[in-house]
Amino acid sequence: TAPTIILGTGGYSNIPNVPGLQEAGYLSSESLFGDKFPKQPYKSLAVLGAGPIGVEFGHVFDAAGTEVTIIQHNVRLVPKEDEEMSEHLLQNYRARGINVILNQDTVEIRQEDGLKVVVTKDRTTGEITETKVEEILVAAGIRPAVEELHLENTGIETLPKGWIKTNEFLETSVDGIYALGDVNGEPAFRHRANYEADIIAHNLYFAKNEEDFRWARYDTLPKVTFSYPEIGSVGLTEAEAIKAGYNVGVGKNYYSSTAKGYAMGINPGDVNDGFVKIVVDKDTNHILGMHVTGPQASILFQPYVNLMNSGVTPLTAINEEI
């Protein structure tokens, strides 16, 4: 026993219950970097799932010369990103020769002639597709590592998918027990876990009273997908802002419209012509979200992360600089 317990057990790859998957064998983001790391690139690979992990590994293997097929349950790649980011990534992957199959249920996996056959069904039309590959990589999301905690023996509440439920101070439903990182929900980013650890440490050891407590907020949590092209984003997508009831304004600027883009040989209309998209509240001039896709996107969006965390409006910031 202890007066304070902090749970940070992380998460595992979510392995879907697909008939034949266990018998055929598969890779995950964990096992790939262990005993199953290939001595040479696979000739062909099917990636099941197209969130950040799926599209990142799809890019890595494609760059190594593997014939890659990405099979996605959703109608979009990286569906939690802004829709225009997803569409731009799809166009670029297909232009590179990556086979992307969207809106699919994986119904069966079998072995045939030394290969693995992934059988999928279109969720709208019911059309069956068979994809023969040398290897399969499962990238179907993250599940919390809670099995060995035996939470059923405690009063700790969990969410429908098994994540540990916490309040704004990262405390569970049991006083004195906290949870941080992948175990308390998505998004599964290391910097989110670091941020939550800072909050818990401050509140437990440095706050003099409850008025000094810090609380977790994720509306300006930045994230990057290291696909090709990269995607960097912070805040609300355009669709999320509209759904939230804001008077939404959108601004876009393409790489081809800048000196840097011109120097890189990017022309208007090129499939690799990335862009910056800013979503604002027209009533207050506050930035609600910023999204960028293209070379060095992970660097380009950082000033907007700082600006959104500062709370100032773009017009105010510009005037102060002047």
Question: Which residues fall in each region the model found?
Answer:
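Glycine/serine-rich phosphate-binding loop and adjoining beta1-alpha1 elements at the start
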Residues: T1-G25, S29, K43-S44
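Short hydrophobic core segments
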Residues: A2-G10, V47-L48, V68, T131-G141, ...
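Rossmann-like dinucleotide-binding cores of NAD(P)H-dependent redox enzymes
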Residues: G34, Y42-A46, P52-E127, P187-N194, ...
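Short loop/edge segments at beta-strand edges and connector loops
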Residues: T9, S28-E30, L102-Q104, P160, ...
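Short, acidic, Ser/Thr-enriched surface-loop or helix-capping motifs
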Residues: R123, L159, N167-E168, E238, ...
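Flexible, glycine-rich terminal cap/loop adjacent to redox cofactors
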Residues: F226-I322
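FAD-site-proximal beta/loop scaffold in flavoenzymes
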Residues: Q22-P41, E130-E210, V305
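Short loop/turn motifs at secondary-structure junctions and domain boundaries
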Residues: E112, E148, G155-E157, M264-D273
